[in-house]
Amino acid sequence: MHFEVHGRTDAEAPTILLSSGLGGSSAYWLPQIEALSDHFRIVTYDHRGTGRTGGEVPTEGGISAMADDVLEIVSALNLEKFHFMGHALGGLIGLDIALRQPRLIDRLVLINAWSKADPHSGRCFDVRIELLEKSGVDAFVKAQPLFLYPAAWMSEHQERLARDDAHGVAHFQGKTNVLRRIAALRAFDIDARLGEIGNPVLVVATKDDLLVPYTRSLRLAEGLPQSELCLLDFGAHAVNITEPDLFNTRLLQFLLPADQT
């Protein structure tokens, strides 16, 4: 597993581990690394089958197998406790760890995640799979921003989107890996077990998320006993990228003691 450590290096530094969504890249968290660096040791990683980790996503194990990869990193760094932040699929990994190894996680942050996949999200993934299988990698990558960002934001960031498209095609994780990762997140269902998770959780959702209805986050906030809900009107699925200042402020309010915010 390829992982990187950023931020504080002192022995007393609290650690936060960041897990991205379907794309699996540690680069997803660049807007958060700067905001967190003064306060935390930050661990980012490329999911199995993606980026510098590479390899194949296993055929079995689903989200739990992805969580095991995180636990491998935790073991390598000798972490006894850490905060965990996950976006979408990454949030599912955090929920899995919170169920299996609750003492490891201090505070958990879930961004546009879910306890059970929504039928609308299923339709979106069906469309993306059909694009990949019938139109190829270029079409799949070019469509991806439509599910991530608000239209107004995309209109103002055309050069960035063009760079992201080129990078996404050049470093595509492979059809088999994409399909296995989508299958894993669609099969994930811990809805009946939310009450077992006693960790403090910040649930972040956006009303304009095209991919994951914000009602899935309402369900998380309802079912998780120690949750706080941050529901935003604008920002879409990748709100930590499109609204970084607003997101980072709320994130630090949740993670830091009151006298440090």
From Swiss-Prot:
HAMAP family: RutD (MF_00832)
Alphabetical UniProt keywords: Hydrolase
Higher taxonomy: Bacteria, Pseudomonadati, Pseudomonadota, Alphaproteobacteria, Hyphomicrobiales
EC primary class: hydrolase
SUPFAM superfamilies per record: alpha/beta-Hydrolases
Gene3D superfamilies the record matches: alpha/beta hydrolase
Coiled-coil features, chain-numbered ranges: none
AB hydrolase-1 domain segment(s): 14-119
Catalytic activity: carbamate + 2 H(+) = NH4(+) + CO2
Pfam families given in the database record: Abhydrolase_1 (PF00561)
GO MF term list: hydrolase activity, acting on carbon-nitrogen (but not peptide) bonds, in linear amides
Protein name: Putative carbamate hydrolase RutD
InterPro entries, per the entry: AB_hydrolase (IPR050471), AB_hydrolase_1 (IPR000073), AB_hydrolase_fold (IPR029058), Pyrimidine_utilisation_RutD (IPR019913)
EC numbers: 3.5.1.-
Family the UniProt entry places it in: Belongs to the AB hydrolase superfamily. Hydrolase RutD family.
Function statement: Involved in pyrimidine catabolism. May facilitate the hydrolysis of carbamate, a reaction that can also occur spontaneously.
GO terms (BP aspect): nitrogen utilization; uracil catabolic process
